[in-house]
From Swiss-Prot:
It comes from Streptococcus equi subsp. zooepidemicus (strain MGCS10565). Pfam families: DUF436. This is UPF0340 protein Sez_1726. Coiled coil: none annotated. Gene3D superfamilies: Hypothetical protein TT1679 (3.40.50.10360). Belongs to the UPF0340 family. SUPFAM superfamilies: TTHA0583/YokD-like.
């Protein structure tokens, strides 16, 4: 796999999702990543630290430049806990959990986040404003309601299926109510 191509495709997909999701500075963005799927394998079977590092690094760079906070979801073996910066956990008053990810318990994305973040910590759950799912890792449990599916500009990254979610406030009030314009579905 050409890692330069992977980096640029990941960047392109992320920028598309960020711009269409209407996520704002200071908000949370969740990344689910199966490096096994990116390499054309089955989720959890052929994890690649190198692939995880390439993707997480570019996602972290792009989000940081916009002031958006990254949370990287781990695999089911650590109950889909998330790694993010300690300052973000404090800002959002998130409860910390004690686990150190490994390649087969947490995954390559979490290991990469521990490498590239300044003060990484693990939390059990978040309510992110948007997210990117590379390899069908099921990020929905960590995206706030109401979730809005986004079809990325590119539906595959390597061998991995790619999906994304944005979120919007609930529409309440019924037929007599009026609503603010929807920034996601312009």
């Amino acid at each position: 796999m050409d890692l330069k191509v992977l980096r640029e495709e990941a960047r392109s997909i992320l920028i598309d999702v960020v711009e269409r999701s209407a996520i704002k500075k200071g908000q949370l963005f969740v990344l689910g990543l199966s490096s096994s799927e990116v390499l054309g394998g089955r989720i959890g079977q052929h994890s690649s630290l190198e692939v995880g590092e390439v993707i997480v690094k570019v996602v972290l760079e792009e989000l940081s430049s916009r002031g958006i906070h990254l949370a990287v979801q781990g695999c089911e073996h650590i109950n889909r806990a998330l790694v993010l910066e300690e300052s973000v956990a404090e800002e959002y008053q998130l409860e910390l959990v004690n686990v150190l990810p490994s390649l087969h318990a947490g995954g390559s994305g979490q290991l990469a986040a521990f490498k590239y973040m300044k003060q990484p910590v693990e939390v059990e759950a978040i309510a992110a404003h948007a997210g990117l799912d590379i390899g069908d890792t099921s990020i929905g449990m960590h995206v706030k309601r109401v979730q809005v599916p986004l079809v990325p500009i590119q539906r595959e990254l390597g061998g991995a299926h790619v999906t994304a979610l944005a979120s919007r406030p609930k529409l309440i009030g019924g037929v007599r109510a009026r609503y603010q314009p929807d920034p996601i579905r312009k």
